[in-house]
Regions:
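Selective transmembrane helix interface/packing segments
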Residues: 1-267
């Protein structure tokens, strides 16, 4: 079919649309479309927090306040108390901010015509660096820089195996930085490519009917309804995936913080 012959070119064009293009300046020193929507997401988050603070009462009222309080309490109970443990209070502001920031960026990216701030590897790398520096800082603060470095090798391992284990653990620690960034980026990128592909299929199959209404074209356009139904299903799944990715990123950060502080307590 002619439609399927055009599909590879359409998919290639779709993928090229996800590349970073400058909105202001150039790629080396400017604002790309992902940076722009990252800024927009930050503004939206600040507005949401301001509205929530203004409407917050002793007894929550309204869908917005109740919904937002549920999200905050979920992060507090499941990630803060559940993962970090007794020291959760001092880490809660960072973890909650991280979760909400990633969540807002992921959700905005699902609105047609907008881009997710987390759709560029540079953005996810920056978030990963923040998380990495955060748990390293608290690890060093808990029992000193030298103590934290030495703690990477478990106690009870004799020389020279302890040196080998220390090198492996050091590599594993820095690998966290890469996995945090790549996991979030790849999941968001892949999801948008899949949605775009199904949208292309639906529009290409529907196009003959839109150009000339006839019974033959109507029958030929029926498969587009199936593609459209699948697209709607994938869109709903992407909403869930966007929330899950924000959760996974925040949970892993909490785990790394907890591990750093647990080592200090054991010493």
């Amino acid at each position: 079919m002619e439609i399927f012959e055009k599909l590879p070119d359409e998919i290639n064009h779709l993928v090229s649309e996800f590349s970073s293009t400058p909105v202001v300046g150039d790629l080396s020193c400017g604002i790309t479309q992902y940076s722009f929507w990252l800024i927009v997401s930050t503004i939206v988050l600040l507005i949401v927090l301001a509205v929530f603070k203004k409407k917050q009462t002793l007894v929550p009222k309204g869908f917005f306040v109740n919904g937002f309080e549920y999200i905050i309490e979920y992060v507090e109970n499941d990630i803060g108390k559940g993962v970090v443990g007794e020291n959760w209070k001092k880490h809660f502001p960072f973890l909650c901010s991280l979760f909400l920031f990633i969540l807002i960026n992921n959700m905005i990216g699902l609105i047609p015509g907008m881009k997710p701030g987390t759709g560029a590897i540079g953005s996810t790398a920056a978030l990963a660096i923040f998380a990495f520096v955060y748990f390293i800082y608290y690890g060093c603060k808990a029992h000193g820089v030298i103590g934290y470095i030495k703690s990477l090798a478990p106690q009870g391992v004799s020389f020279p195996m302890n040196v080998l284990v220390w090198v492996v653990e050091l590599f594993s620690t820095f690998l966290r930085l890469i996995t945090l960034a790549v996991r979030l980026f790849c999941n968001m990128f892949a999801g948008h490519v899949v949605m775009g592909s199904f949208a292309i299929m639906a529009s290409m199959l529907m196009q003959p009917l839109l150009q000339q209404v006839s019974a033959a074209h109507a029958v030929g356009a029926l498969p587009s309804l199936a593609w459209l139904a699948i697209l709607i299903l994938i869109y709903a799944i992407e909403l869930v995936v966007g929330a899950i990715q924000a959760y996974v990123f925040t949970v892993l950060t909490a785990v790394y913080v907890s591990e750093a502080e647990e080592v200090a307590e054991e010493e």
